[in-house]
Structures are given as C-alpha cells and as structure tokens.
Amino acid sequence: MQIPKPNNSTWTDDQWEAIVSEGQDILVAAAAGSGKTAVLVERLIRKMTRPEHPVDVDRLLVVTFTNASAAEMKHRITEALEKELAKNPGSLHMRRQLSLMNRANISTLHSFCLQVLRTFYYEIDLDPGFRLADQTEGELLGDEVLDELFEDEYKAGKPSFFELVDRYTSDRHDLDLQWLVKRIYDFSRSHPSPEQWMRAFLSLYDVDAQTKVEELPFYPYIKEDLSLVLRSCQELLERALSLSKEPGGPAPRAENFIDDLEQVNELIRHQDDFEKLYELLPNVNFKRLKTCKGDEYDPVLLEKATDARNQAKKQLEKLKDEYFMRSPAQHLKSLAEMKPIVETLVELVIQFGERFERAKQEKSIVDFSDLEHYCLRILAEQDAEGHLIETEAAKYYQQQFEEVLVDEYQDTNLVQETILKLVSKGEHSSEGNLFMVGDVKQSIYRFRLAEPMLFLNKYKHFQPDGKETGKRIDLNKNFRSRSDVLDSTNFLFKQLMGETVGEIEYDEQAELKLGASYPESKDTTTEMLLVHLDQQEAETGEEREELETVQFEARIIAKKIKELVEQPFQVYDAKQQMTRNLQYRDIVILLRSMPWAPQMMEELKKQGIPVYANLSSGYFEATEVSVILSLLKVIDNPYQDIPLAAVLRSPLVHLDENELALIRTSDKKGTYYDAVKAFMSVTHSDHPTCKKLERFFQLLRKWRDFSINHSVAELIWEVYRDTQYLDYVGGMPGGKQRQANLRALYDRAKQYEKAAFRGLFRFLRFIERMQERGDDLGAAKTFSETEDVVRMMTIHSSKGLEFPVVFTVGLGRNFNMMDLNQSYLLDKELGFGSKYIHPELRISYATLPLVAMKKKMRKELLSEELRVLYVALTRAKEKLFLVGSVKNQVKALSKWQNAATGEEWLLPDFERYQSKTYLDFIGPALIRHQAMSSVLEETGDVVLSHPSTFTISFTQASDLLKEDMSLEKKEQDEIVQALMDGLPVEGYGDADEKVAERLSWKYPYLAASQVGTKQSVSEIKRMKEIQDEYSVPSSIRKARATLYDRPAFMKKKTLTAAEQGTAMHTVMQHIPLPSEEPYDESRIGHLLDSLQQRDLLTDEQVQSINQEGIAAFFSTSIGQKLLKADWVKREVSFSMVLPVKEVYSHIDTEGEPVLIQGMIDCLFETDGKLYLLDYKTDRVQGRYTGGIDAAVPILKKRYETQIALYAKAVERLTNRTLEEKILYFFDGNVEISL
C-alpha cells in the first residue's frame, strides 16, 4: 500500500509516487528540469529514516553516470542525514547512517565493478595485486599483441589469412586490417558475450542458391527504407499533380505527373518483392516535361511542381544506385563469397582477444572494459547454449542490496544492464527492487555505445498501474524554465520527434509541463536569429571582406548580448526571490562541438564580450613541447626530415631559413640528415652555420648514447640540463606556464615507465597515440563560478546544467556523418557489414548488409541529433536564442515550405530523414508557426495553432560587415579623428612630426598591391575594363539602345544570364565533334534530351537553350571548319606565369610575376591549321543604337585582352602559331575574328 502524501508536501503527485513506490521494478521517465535528482535523493533519505524497517545506507546500491554525480549525491545525502540528526540528536540510527557513509555504494558502475573484482578476484583467477591501466597504456599493449599475432599468421602462411589481407589492406601496409581487428574487438565488448555476438553475425553471409534476399536478417531495414522512399516519391508527385490543377498551374504537365505517379504506384504495389523491384525500377522513365510558356502559367506554381517532380526523380535514381545496380542473385553470390573471409576475420579477432587478455594478466593489469566483463564472469556463468546462470557471488549481492537505484538509465549499455539484473531481484522475485531514473529524450551518448532502446523497451512494456509488469512513472513537469521556453520546445518537438526519426513519440506524456513560478516578463519570447550569407558584390562594385560563418554568428550574438545587458534584461533569482539585472555569467553559448569555439571566442572578445571556454587542447602544439618532442624523435632516428628541420630552426640550434636552404643545396635528393652531413663535410669548420651544427651534433651523439642505458625521463632531464632550455623558456612570455608544460612532459615519461614500458621509440609512439585520440596533458584552467563572463561549451557538457539565457548556435552546420561512409560498419543488432572487395580486379561495392546498416545507423544518428537539440533547448531558464546561417534566404524558406507538407503535427518521416543540419529540422517546423508571417511573402498552407511565441529575423551578412563593432577599430577611429581635429592624443607625447610623417606617407608600390599574385583571365579582363573607354558606364549607355525593365510584378522567375550561359557552354562541351552529319534543330533537341536524362541539364536549362542559334552556328564558316576538324579540345584549362608589366602596362614594378589561370572554350585543328574559338551568350541584338556594326568594335575591345591571353597560353602549350582567333555570339549569330 502506497504511503499517502502529507498535506503540507511540496512534491507533485507524480514525484511523490516516484519517492514512495516499491515492491516491483520501477522506471521513472523524468523530463528535463523535472527534479529527478531531488526525487532520487529523497527516496534514499526516506528509506534510511522511515520509522518502520529503515534501511542502512550500505544496503543500497546507487549507480550514477559520472564520479561528479556520485560525489554530489553523497554530499546531499550526508547533509540530509545531518539535518535529521540535528532534529533528533539522540538517534543512534542516524549516527550509524552517517558513520556508514564512507561504505555507501554510491558510485559509477565501473567503480562498483572494481569493488566486485577486489572482493571476488579468486573466482576468475585474477591476481589480487592487479592495477587499473590507463587507456593509452592498454592501447600500446594491444598494438604489441596485434603485431605479434600478424607476424605469426604471416609465418603460418594460411591461404585464408592471405586472402583476408588482400581484401582489407592497401598495397603498402596492413594497418587497415589491424585497425579493423581492433575496431571489431572494441565494439564487441559492448555485448555481454563478445565471441557469441561475433559468431552470430556470420548469419548475414549464410546464403545458398535457395536463399531469398527477403529472408535475411538485415532485410527489414532495407524494406523500411524502400517503403519510406517510395511513399515520399508518391507524395511529391501527388503534390506536383495537385499544383498543376490549381489556377495558373502547369496544366499541360499534369499528363507527365500522372504517368510518373502510376510508375511509382506500381513500384509501391511490389515493394515487398525485391526481385520484382529489380525488374521494374530500371525501366522507370520520367518523360520530357510538356512545354509551359506564356503568361497564363504562374511561375511560382510551375517551379514548385517541377521541383517536386525532380526530387522524386532523384530519389528513385538514388534507390536504383543503392540497391538495384546488381541482381538479387549477384548480391547473394557476393555474400556467399564473403562468408569464409568474414569467418577468418572473426577468428582473428577472437585470437587477438585471447592473446590480449593473457598479456594483460602477465602484467597484472585490467582496463575499463575488463572491469565490466570480469565482473560479469564473477556474477554469471554461461551454459552450453550461451545462457547466463547466476553464481553465488550474484546471490550474495542480491541478498546484500535492498534496492538498486540507477541514475541516467538511458545511457547504459547491454553489458551494464546485464550486471544490474544480476545484482537485483527483478528476475527471480515478484517484488523487483530495480529503480531506474532517466529520460530517453536526453540519451546523447550512443557514440560511447549507450543503448537507449533498453529504456524504450521498458517504457513501452511497463505500465502506470504496474500490474503484471514493472511500474512506469512519468515526471513531465518542468521546474526550470519559463513557459516561453517550454512552449517553444514543445512546438518544435511535437513536429520533429517520432518513432521513425527520434525513436519515441513526443506525445502528451512526453511534452514538458510548466512547473516553475516566475514573475511576468515581456522579453522572454524565443528568438530565431538567422544570418543570410549570400555574398554578392555590393552596388558600389566593391568586394566585401570575406568572413567565416562563425564570425558572422559571433557578431550577431555579441549584438544581442549587448542589448540584453544594456536594457538591462531582468532575470529571476529563485534563492533571493527577486529579479535582478542580467549578468554575463547568466549567459551560455552552446555548440554541437568545439572547433568553432576559438574563432567565436576571439570575435566575441573583439566585440567587448567577456567569454570563457575550456579549450583543453593545444598542449602538444605549444612551441616548447613540440620542440622537445621533435628533438626526441631526432635522437631516436635522425633520418626524419620534419623533426630534424624543426629542431635546427628552434632556439636549440638557431638556424634561420636561409641557412636551412643552404644546407639542402648540398644534397637535394637525400634525406635532410644526409644533406646536413654533406654540408658539414664540404664546409670549412669556421663557417658560422657549421659551428652551430657541430655543437648540436656533439650533443646529439651524447644523447643517443645516453638513451641506450637510461630511461626516457632521465634523457628528457639530461636534455633540459645540457641545453638550459627549461631556463630559456622561463624567460619567454608566459614563462611559468611553458616551464610547467615541459615538467609535465617529464612527469608523463616517468608515469609511462612505471607502467613497465621502456624505450624512446615506444614512448614517442605512446605520445602519438595520445595526440591521435585528442588527449591533452595540459592542466585545466582555474575558473571561478562567480566570474562574470559568458560561458561557452558543448551541448554534451551542458547536460544537467541550467542558465537563464541560452544561445544555441551553429544550427546550419552539417551533422557529422563521416562514419556512414566507411568501407565497413558495425551494428549491435546486425553485426558486421562490409563492401565486397575483389582482390584481383580491385573493385569494390557496397553489399546489402552494409547498405542496410547505413540506413539503420543514419536513422539512429538523426534520432541522437534530435535528442542533442532537445538537451540544448531545455538548458534555458528564461530566454532562448536559436542562431544559424543559410546561404540563401529565399532558397532556404522555399525548401522549408516544401518540406512542411500535410496537416499532421508530425512532419513527414522522409523529410526528417533527409535532414543534414539542425536548421533542416527546425526550419520546416517553424514555417508552420504564425510568427513566420514576418519573413514570408505568403504563409504556408498549414499554420499550426499553438501558444508558443517566436520572433524570427534574417540579418544580411553585409550588414554585419558594416557593423564592425571591434573595440580596437573604435580606438583607431578615435585616434584618427583626434589627429584630424588637431587635438592631442593621450599617451603619444610630442610626436607631432612623426605622426604627420606617417599619415602623409604613401606606399610606393600601390598599383602592384592592387593586383593579386594569382588571377584568372576573367579578373584581368574586369580590371582592364575599369580603364577601358569602351567599358566606362557612360560610354556603354551612349552606345546601347534604351531598354526599359518590366515592373517587378510582371517579371517571370527565369534563369539568370550567367546560369543561361553555363547551360549553353554545357551543351557546346558535350556536342559530339567532329561530325560528318550536320547539326539541325532536331538533332540538337535529341542531344538536349540525352543531357537531361543524364542530369547534366535541368528542365529549366533545357528550356533556356537557343537551339536555333546553335544550328545557325554550325552553318557558319567557322562552324563548318569545326565539324570537319582533325581534332577538337574543349574546356582547356591552363596556368601560366607572366611578368606583371606584361599584363598591366600601367604598373612599373620590374620582375614581379603574376600567375594567370583560365579556361579556353574550344581549340581545334582543321587542315593542319590551329583555331581558337570562344563562344559568348552576351545579349547583342537590340542592345546597340547603331546595330551590329556599332557593336563589333565595342565587343572586340572588351574581349581582346581575354583572347590575347588565351592565344599566348595556346602558343606556349603547343609551340605553334594560331591561324585565327574567333569570338562567336549566339545572340545575333555574330562572328568576330581577332
């Protein structure tokens, strides 16, 4: 019977139920900010302090995710016990609980496993004096074992091993295969029975002549993907058809859409039959679209319908490429061929595991993975069928623990789940005692092999009433955030999180409910800040400064932070129960990962925003550390060019770049060490460079001898002493930190040798391993929580934290999906999927298991990214900012509108499955919010009714460039202004003359500085036009006929002139030449159809092609020569170096070169004569008042520089003289010989 909640209790009913319920396994689904830690602590305290049957604290097992969480929980419990003791000082029970706290089993699961090993080591013949190895030590030992294993296999000479090597290694080394063995071994350790799991995945390749693809274990994931894509194509084509029936829609194309839709429906009817799909899909043919020209067709509807059809077409093409490039029989044959290869691989991994374990036992060490697996061996044995049978040790813990409580249960893996079951009573008792707390929506550690499905399966199986199952309790009241934050989060995730993508429905139970009480505020609306990056030239023609996306976002964040602080924004202090002004420390900036952090910090600091981020990297890049590491590499092996050059250039030897170059001239082909020896042998000993080298090599010989009989740590200290380098760096800026860095390297060498490793080479390999993993020896920066600065951290680091104001940034960055592109994948359920690799032909392609895993893992990755986004949004207490960048505002809004179809709350599965960024998730969801009316010309078809409030704004990147808010810039402006006003500048003394001299100084090579060292021919042409009388705007306007633009509302959306030009060049590039047959409009039309089928041209580009102009070109004299050419080369790229004066006659600089790059449209030879042809799509007809005759001299002058440079390049390349250089303008069929 449940204990009733006291009348004066502040706990909610659901929280109270979680505190007092018992008698069965309990799962508490605790949403963000629902007070789960407080509930867990209260449950523990009540168990220890209840009047009847109190529980001693050492009879409870509490498993936390981190050591910090365990320490915090111990502290909270101790405080609560002390308060209880203060109320009743005579309580012996309270005193006993406090005395037992040092024995309390409140720890991470790894710590508990370590305790089990210390207690029952004898059950598995483990050395009681074992120690825990760090990760790097374990990896080095594993590398040694693997090297020995491969050496033995090579000696044994088994054909199966050599075939494995042939398929999974490069021509140069077998490191790829070694890495694969380690990868499978490490991955298998997340399964309770690694060997059993590896042998099980061989069933993926267990096929014969009677096997059907549909029968294989991975097929359900292929079937799901096929269904997802085909349904998406169906929806897209139905949308296109619907648009064609609207007023102004592309009605003639309805016939196309109906035909396309019928083909897709036929595929859907057979989507469960892989063989039938293989027959049907290659025959799907989207015919050429009907022409829709004229003002009666709405260009917007036309574009939307065409885009929908093109999307469907591309999806079907991708489906064909992924699954149906080979017949089902060929796919099965590939799997059958791979089975013996995979069997050999599995046996190799098992051998490695056995040898690795023996090697660790010999050294009496265990690694973190061993802790769990050894604990599992102590708690359970396997029977003949692989089932786990609990041991006496497991029964001991079942009797020992009254209850097992697990925090952050959503982040456990299968091994940990098995251990928890073995020490709890749930499997063998009607009164389960496993209490699990977590939130699957915050499961963000799949990359560490956490398994959120464990939580989800229980969530679906357990019931709120607990009858015949475990009990499920939902804590969905949020006591952290204002309603604006909760409503915004709910609005987004009701549309984004579902079973297919998200792995859980964001239903009423999952929604966040308001639990916190805040005073009213008008400024807490969630803000979406978007940067429009499309950087076109300003109207003035001046090119804008190029800034990276991170800098743009940093500037918009800085602007907002300044506004918040200057207003000032009011935040509520719950402890003081009062509102106060916002401080910098109330703000956090959350990033998905830290690569952006250094640049963002730098930009924010420039804008005057105090900011802190724990950038715990850069130790190995520190100059003083990299110099010593390079020196150690040279001591180990001087035949390493880069380390040797680094040491010679460093303060240890002090050679400059000229001396290094001089040394290389002594031996240009050998190693740099050979060059040094050669230089010293031919150079007089009194030469300054030779003296430096001689001193260094005397020390080097000494150190190499010293390293033979001494430890690495002793060698490092000897180097410090001989070079006095430790003292030297102490005198540099930041000297104390530099000395500390060098001492840390010495200390690490001592630790390395304590682990029974020896030798300089192995130590250097050990350091390389640390660098590869991103480990860092640098101490974390000391930082006070009270320091008034903006925090910057990853979303993962923010989990469990809360801040009044949160900026979630970088929402336009692509998700990291690199792992999905590997040649093989590993999955807990499906096992091992690999490309098929033919050893002789050296061809490879994805097998069906690999494709199935890729699809499965993509959905899992996207689900994880959704959960990461949920964590980010739920950190905010009072105000939330979402910050991202798009390349083009119009295209982004159009894309989001197309994705936000249907009236269901949940966005279509396929649209969410296609997401590559957080904006791909958020954009379509926000499109359906009423707030989007502020940025849309017309709102979408569906606007969802919801209490959430958003403000959405786009900022042009150009505006952020104009607002250079840098403090340094402001200071410079102030100084310049003071000088212009004749006012004294503080801090500069009587330096009037020097200031005047500097301000009046002119750079003598100004003209040369305006020319880049590398330029394209087009850039040179534009530079010439600036000085060209024919290109002065006023002159052009005089020559051109007056044309009037249509009003904007009458314009159709068409391809730009540049896009039309690109399309025309694509056609001319792919016309078969030379040709005996003439090119008329009919033949050109067939060519366009072919180019469209091959996706080289879009429908819009085909419509824009001047077919009549191309046909007319081939009837000209130059066109005829081209048809009869001996050979034709098109799109000929070149690079050549010319003196700058030869390109720009107004620049007097002698000897300065400029690298010129360009692309020649067409070069051909006819009757032994060489011709250069450049075709243009410029508008000519009707543009010049004097007609074509007036246009020719202007066009000649405009393009003469370009053609002259092309001619010079051709003559250099071929060593021949051009017969003729021709410009051809398709508009007007104008041929100009230059």
Swiss-Prot record:
Query: Mind listing the UniProt keywords for this protein, alphabetically?
Result: ATP-binding, DNA damage, DNA repair, DNA-binding, Exonuclease, Helicase, Hydrolase, Isomerase, Nuclease, Nucleotide-binding
A GO molecular-function descriptor: ATP hydrolysis activity
Q: Domain UvrD-like helicase ATP-binding spans what residues?
A: 9-482
Q: Residues in domain UvrD-like helicase C-terminal?
A: 509-800
| Superkingdom classification of source | Bacteria
Tell me the residue numbers annotated for binding ATP.
A30, A31, A32, G33, S34, G35, K36, T37
Pfam families linked to this entry:
PDDEXK_1, UvrD-helicase, UvrD_C
Q: Which NCBIfam families match?
A: addA_Gpos (TIGR02785)
Biological role: The heterodimer acts as both an ATP-dependent DNA helicase and an ATP-dependent, dual-direction single-stranded exonuclease. Recognizes the chi site generating a DNA molecule suitable for the initiation of homologous recombination. The AddA nuclease domain is required for chi fragment generation; this subunit has the helicase and 3' -> 5' nuclease activities.
Name this polypeptide is given: ATP-dependent helicase/nuclease subunit A
Organism, by scientific name, is Bacillus pumilus (strain SAFR-032)
The protein's gene is named addA
